[in-house]
Amino acid sequence: MNNNHWLERTELLIKQQGLDTLQKAHILIVGLGGVGSFAAEFIARAGVGSLTIVDGDCVSLSNINRQLPALHSTVGKNKTEVMAARLLDINPQLNLTVIHEFLTPERATEIVTPKFDYVIDCIDSITPKLNLILSAKRQRVRLVSCMGAGGATDVSQIKVADLMKTYNCPLAKFIRKRLKNERIDSGIKAVFSSEIVSKDSMQRTEGLDYKKSFYGTISFMPAAFGLHAAATAINYLLKRPATP
């Protein structure tokens, strides 16, 4: 396997054809918090050849309980910078594009193009999330959108389903409503939890970064969401019919 010897266990499972498929793929991940950072890690370790990561945030002390780039030694650093170093240490041959910015409606339209084989949405605020979903839908690029991982602790209730069939998730409820206003009522995969959210863990904010509130979060729930998102993308790529 030459320089890809580190993927020998993966090759045993998906064979050389599977490795070649993933090597040729280009995935876009937007949001590198608790969900997106783990999704990026799993994508890189699977041997995906090209990856674009987008986030405009810096590591803060409150991120340490759940986010992969967050350590006491990385507080204040750009999440994209920390994750880029980590991903390239996993796979030095990774074709990595780093975009250090928050996703505006205009940039969502510019960034999401048919060159991507899959988009993983790990944004945790409504307006940018909606813009990313709409951009992927308009460009006909496959997407999985991660809903709220906060306020829950039962990983067995994490599911992947059509967004319009999600339930018990406050974030998904808002996104469903907004998408229906855009006349979109199917065709978007979502990672969500069916667990009833712990409302007493919610805290209001000043509306910074499009957020009006957030829920308390345990270490493993965002990572589990990222795992489901990465698996959804990778399994789709491996099962997709080969193009001539």
Regions found by a protein language model. Give the residues of each.
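Glycine-rich phosphate-binding loop and adjoining beta1-alpha1-beta2 segment
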Residues: 48, 53-91
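Conserved N-terminal Rossmann-fold NAD(P)-binding element of oxidoreductases
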Residues: 29-31, 54
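N-terminal charged helix/coil linker that caps or initiates catalytic domains
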Residues: 1-28, 61
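Hydrophobic/small residue at the entry helix of a nucleotide-binding pocket
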Residues: 35
